């Protein structure tokens, strides 16, 4: 199995601006399983610009539409759970059953967020954590 992975920027898959790649290696056997596109500062700038544009659209999206979109993401994750888990296993060496659980957990988080978009109360709750991302 050998794959080429691009960058998803502004709604489409593409190579990096300088066509650079790096090897994706299976840590269990050190086999090359693919090549991923190596982002340049130009690519990062394009991604940030696209994200800023997307945020302006998302801000104007009705809560029920946001919920629908986020739920579809959860559905797609579940639909592709087996292949995503397989790739996770190859890329990070995680046991397949554990990878499937992690992928399922990601879908659960999207489902939870889909429901939360329906509950907009106009309040902000501060994090108790001192670690901010």
Predicted regions and their residues:
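Hydrophobic face of amphipathic alpha-helices that form TPR/SEL1-like repeat modules
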Residues: 1-28
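Conserved small/polar residues in nucleotide/adenosyl-binding loops
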Residues: 131-133
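Glycine-rich loop-to-alpha-helix module at the N-terminal edge of alpha/beta enzyme cores
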Residues: 33-121
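Long, charged, glycine-rich C-terminal linkers/tails
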Residues: 123-127
């Amino acid at each position: 199995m050998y794959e080429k992975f691009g960058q998803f920027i502004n709604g489409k898959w593409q190579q990096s601006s300088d066509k650079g790649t790096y090897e994706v290696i299976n840590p269990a056997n050190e086999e090359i399983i693919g090549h991923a596109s190596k982002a340049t500062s130009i690519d990062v700038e394009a991604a940030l610009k696209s994200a800023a544009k997307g945020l302006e659209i998302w801000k104007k999206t009705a809560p029920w539409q946001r919920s629908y979109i986020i739920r579809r993401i959860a559905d797609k994750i579940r639909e592709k759970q087996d292949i995503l888990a397989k790739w996770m296993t190859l890329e990070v060496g995680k046991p397949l059953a554990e990878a499937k659980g992690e992928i399922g957990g990601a879908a659960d988080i999207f489902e939870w967020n889909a429901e939360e978009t329906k509950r907009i109360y106009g309040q902000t709750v501060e994090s108790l954590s001192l670690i901010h991302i």
